């Protein structure tokens, strides 16, 4: 861990009413004496002059001093809050750098110091960047929940449960004559099942949190001329795709990134799916399936003039059967302006079915509400925590090891192998909060932060 004293502008670059310079490290007191002529009282706002090396006043403002470890970074921290002109702030940083042993902070280094000094865990540190980058009230609320430790709490509980079960299993192994009895008495199995269930709940919440942060990838798929491109245009609010009566007009993947009440949505229009000998169209269809396989949701577009069916298994069983097992599907019966169908939503065998006219826009607003709901939008802002893709991957790894451990227990009564799978699950979960994390990962995470955070 670095022992350097670092300085950076904590407010956004440019012109503003107030500009803040932040200093963290052992030399913060030296900076106070050099720039202010005195050390401000801890946690008191001190209005004073900021002076250069010859004693001339650079600016006037508020100085705040926080004595470590009772500060954001866990070190001595000095904040100089002056006027927000960039020239003035640059002059002030230059003055601070004249004090021996001070250097400019790297992006995210203040938060990294807080993490290293156990003031934050890794999910809380990441939540700072997510709160700054939030594009909706829901994302901001969820990021704040993570910053306050809600996600960390769930992960710590899982780690503790896995660790305790692992210790119990290893204790059973220490008594080989009784190991089979320990493993078959149901106590270990019940504890393992409870952990798997809890992890599944956390995974679902994290998946929702990831969608709130990163957006939901929605693929519009169906047969040619079902109205996929018209729906893309209707959702995007502009003519993004060429629309004609000729089947197969769209031959490549088209993407639009929009926000629904601040919630990011990535919409992808794909080539119509059908058997074809056209080489270019075949490539487009292959790309369409690649997008479908990595989607968060599929909007299955159906030309309502060609069938009265609402169950997707009746409409196109081969398509539905080829979809990934856990991929959510919303059925869109298009061309309601021609069929005269009521513009309503129904549930059919577990599938949401919407009747719309992509051409006229009828029913599209209701579909947008549906998509917002899938992304976790809540008007009362009572949401969960925010999560990143790396969190989902770590949870998936942990879940995989727990399932393997379950197999070792149920099929083979193999205590040593179960203990090893529990250990691997524990490591995967601990990576989320940074308890066991490589330096390379830490560098990648904090380098994406703003300078001054």
Curated annotation (Swiss-Prot):
Binding annotation for Mg(2+): 229, 250
Domain annotation TrmE-type G: ranges: 215-376
The cofactors named for this UniProt entry are: K(+)
Top-rank taxon, per record: Bacteria
- Kindly list the places in or outside the cell where this protein is found, as annotated in its UniProt entry: Cytoplasm
Q: Which NCBIfam families does UniProt cross-reference here?
A: mnmE_trmE_thdF (TIGR00450), PRK05291.1-3 (NF003661), small_GTP (TIGR00231)
Family under the similarity heading: Belongs to the TRAFAC class TrmE-Era-EngA-EngB-Septin-like GTPase superfamily. TrmE GTPase family.
Q: What is this protein called?
A: tRNA modification GTPase MnmE
Query: What species is given as this protein's source?
Result: Shewanella putrefaciens (strain CN-32 / ATCC BAA-453)
């Amino acid at each position: 861990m670095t022992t350097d004293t670092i300085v950076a502008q904590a407010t956004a670059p440019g012109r503003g009413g107030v500009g803040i310079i932040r200093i963290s490290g052992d030399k913060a007191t030296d900076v106070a004496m050099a720039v202010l002529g005195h050390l401000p009282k801890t946690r008191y706002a001190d209005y004073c002059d900021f002076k250069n090396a010859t004693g001339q006043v650079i600016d006037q403002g508020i100085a705040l001093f926080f004595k470590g470890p009772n500060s954001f970074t866990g070190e001595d921290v000095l904040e100089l809050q002056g006027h927000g002109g960039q020239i003035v702030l640059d002059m002030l940083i230059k003055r601070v750098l004249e004090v021996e042993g001070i250097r400019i902070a790297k992006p995210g280094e203040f938060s990294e110091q807080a993490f290293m000094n156990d003031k934050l865990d890794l999910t809380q540190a990441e939540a700072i960047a997510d709160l700054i980058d939030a594009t909706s009230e829901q994302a901001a609320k969820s990021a704040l929940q993570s910053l306050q430790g809600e996600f960390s709490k769930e992960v710590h509980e899982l780690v503790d449960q896995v660790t305790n079960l692992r210790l119990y299993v290893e204790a059973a192994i220490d008594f080989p004559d009784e190991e089979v009895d320990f493993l078959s008495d149901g106590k270990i199995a019940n504890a393992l099942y409870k952990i798997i269930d809890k992890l599944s709940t956390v995974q679902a919440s994290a998946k929702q949190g990831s969608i709130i942060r990163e957006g939901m990838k929605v693929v519009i798929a169906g047969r040619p001329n079902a109205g996929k491109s018209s729906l893309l245009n209707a959702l995007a609010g502009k003519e993004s795709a060429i629309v004609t009566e000729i089947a197969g007009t769209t031959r490549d993947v088209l993407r639009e990134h929009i926000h629904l009440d601040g919630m990011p949505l990535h919409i992808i229009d794909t080539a119509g799916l059908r058997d074809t000998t056209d080489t270019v169209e075949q490539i487009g269809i292959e790309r369409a399936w690649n997008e479908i396989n990595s989607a968060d949701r599929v909007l299955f577009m159906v030309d309502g003039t060609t069938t009265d069916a609402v169950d997707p298994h009746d409409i196109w069983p081969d398509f539905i059967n080829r979809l990934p097992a856990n991929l959510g599907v919303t059925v869109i019966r298009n061309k309601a302006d021609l069929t005269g169908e009521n513009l309503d939503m129904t549930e059919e065998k577990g599938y949401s079915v919407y009747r719309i006219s992509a051409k006229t826009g009828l029913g599209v607003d209701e579909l947008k509400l549906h998509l917002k709901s899938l992304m976790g939008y809540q008007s009362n802002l009572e949401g969960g925590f925010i999560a990143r893709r790396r969190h989902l991957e770590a949870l998936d790894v942990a879940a995989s090891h727990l399932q393997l451990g379950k197999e070792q227990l149920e099929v083979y009564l193999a205590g040593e192998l179960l203990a090893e799978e529990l250990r691997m699950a524990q490591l995967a979960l601990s990576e989320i909060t940074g308890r066991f994390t490589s330096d390379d990962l830490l560098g990648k995470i904090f380098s994406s932060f703003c300078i001054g955070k």
